[in-house]
């Protein structure tokens, strides 16, 4: 056995993945230095929440980012992929609270300080887990620069931005409608809400007019909110109610007079066309209330019970009150009917409690002014969305933006940097802890109890992680970042906020490209969730198949912005591909003769197969690089796969064997070099997708470079492109395939050689150059070239390809009837194909609407099939 083989006989990723990652860390290959002679390339990793382990969505997101980073590192950029984690305020608080409840401890009983100590312990544990998981995936991130949204320097950035916005008049405290969780007793962002289909009711209720027998019938799904009604709205164009606009109604059970107002918000076709308006407990009603200057009556406590304004229902839970109110409406004759109704109900995604829209005094950011420049940078193309269609999603939100509620009634998170003087009531907003009242000099101060929305700190991620507000070397060199890869579900909540935060605080965009990916669904297309039990743990997949196989499955065939389905069979196929590369590499290592390689390293006397594979490699380098630049990572990955499996492993390695096992020293030396160069170039193209296997092979097949991670990315070379040889070689390969298929159909074993006679349809040179390959790969005892079809023997089996007609005198080996049967099957197959093409081309819609190239391709197929059919019919005729 050749002593060049330094890799194990069988492919086992468990044997080397951990060792390889350790080698990378020790080599500091992922820790870039500020190098003014190199261009920087930066990606900040979307920080995973410290609420548990990573899922397949994280695996997809990070595989895509790692793909880009590894390519740019090999292209000579100073690449920084900055990792980190998000403190995930409410999500983490709920998790820790639930863990404590298992031991009988309650958050409120522990007190803020003791509870936060437990959360910090949790964060340390889960940050470590996330870090380990990212490394197992092969992420080439710089963990020496890892950030956490609760780090001191990030907290400093958060306070600096809050104070700046407050001083600019862009942060204020006021009453607005919020999503309120009665269980967690905090305001929530829209991102923390899930919608569940709910089987409820529409209660139709009479609202009588004051001093009249008339009434309006309204329909509501939340009768308990009647207690806070301050109007009923109708559409100004609704003929049924025009005469009632401006009149008063008596609110049932409450006996409060409320007006009938006209508002375009009301849909004439929906329900009864009359809508009860509860400004304090519905976001749409809130807007109607503002337009008509209606009173805002809050009828609930923070825990979801009815407050003192609810009269006899005071103290009841909201659903208890609902039952009591419906019963009373029925008793007093106000309930008209009850209709079953299916509708979506908003729930807190962490505790599954139904949300109560409620007016609450919170801290807000004024958004209109901040949104304008953020819209402009996308419109101008300074920031690009990939795919472009997602900029519409972005514009839709930004152009209809509301003020952002940034306060949360929680303990875990960035405490709002606001203090209140207990003596004079002054509000002090300060970067540092306030010690003395700026108005009365009192030291009797108390800090605001609330923390900031998690997204507030996340919005600063691209620059706070690089040291801002300090002017650091990293910030100057690596900002703005290049690409943000993220899911389409957080364009509103995170991407948009990073854009306006970067523009407002850095006066620069935070990134140049937003690469959007979809979500990973199960094999049936369902969203993965704990409740459905269809989630897949990426670590379990890695343990079974290796990280490279999982990465390859997630990236290959995946188009930007589209959801993907997870099939374990595809991961297994990816592992089979890795195994193929492993075995091909062992073949190359086993046969390489370093002395001959060195002797003929500058020799360019390539045979047709050498020229062909170098030309194909060159074209693939161009296609892969172009696709990466367009962020078509799935397409790039597929191109590498097709080349390495179908062209290099399946064909070139086989084509190299006659040379390597021959006697021509120079030919062997040249082919050794081609084998080596094509394999190492292929490994480099594959490296961003499958980093572990490519590194293990690379460091064992050559000695000049310590790692593939910093080796040079392959470049397109015009002089290696040879379309003529590619065409010739495709004819040879098609002919060999055809001969093999015939032999298989005829049950002729490879050991039984037979003469092959070739009539070339498109020049005979290709087939003459490939003569040796017919002998070695098609079991040819002899190869004869015919000048015309008439020279073909009558007693021969035939095969037709697009470049040749091939005849094999096999009648002493095969059954004549069997050959006729085979030819008739081929005839039927070709007739069906011709019928299909003719039908397509006779379809006017297809010819008019399909691209010209597609129509021409169909025409060419039709001509080819007709030629092949003609040849088959001739053979049938000759055998009769």
Swiss-Prot record:
UniProt GO BP: valyl-tRNA aminoacylation
Catalytic activity: tRNA(Val) + L-valine + ATP = L-valyl-tRNA(Val) + AMP + diphosphate
Gene Ontology annotations for the cellular component aspect, listed alphabetically: cytosol
Residues at which ATP binds: 530
Superkingdom per UniProt: Bacteria
Function (record text): Catalyzes the attachment of valine to tRNA(Val). As ValRS can inadvertently accommodate and process structurally similar amino acids such as threonine, to avoid such errors, it has a 'posttransfer' editing activity that hydrolyzes mischarged Thr-tRNA(Val) in a tRNA-dependent manner.
PANTHER family: VALINE--TRNA LIGASE, CHLOROPLASTIC_MITOCHONDRIAL 2 (PTHR11946:SF93), VALYL-TRNA SYNTHETASES (PTHR11946)
Name by which UniProt lists this protein: Valine--tRNA ligase
